[in-house]
């Protein structure tokens, strides 16, 4: 398995496997929540989509079932994960088709694996985080294994403050 897939899967296993994701935020900054857990030390900020659009054949799709739609930034210092960007779309993504993240005029490809997607490397993570501190919204476009096209929009209000708080909590 590729390193760019293995590390995010380890992170998500910790987040979801430990029920850490279901906990309440330790801090909130407008549209972003900050979370942390110990053993191992794990800190992340997350936001849910403020607008969700689902289409099939170019028309609005009404009967679409999706799980949680979340944009994350994760810090797991023990595994040298320092600001990893990830997106949970609430459904399995179409294999071998990039997920597109747009912040302002900047566009980034995210690599899908099951129902999650990540940038290919930490350099792209850094570029995305910088764009997020400067932008007002982040829009993610993807397609499900069933052919449903989705467009999820996230507010970036409070992102910069939440990012600073998360890094402080994780000592990075």
Regions picked out by a protein language model, each given a short descriptive name:
Residues 7-16:
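Bacterial N-terminal signal peptides
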Residues 21-172:
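A generic "folded-domain core" signal
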Residues 1-4:
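Positively charged n-region of N-terminal signal peptides that target proteins for export
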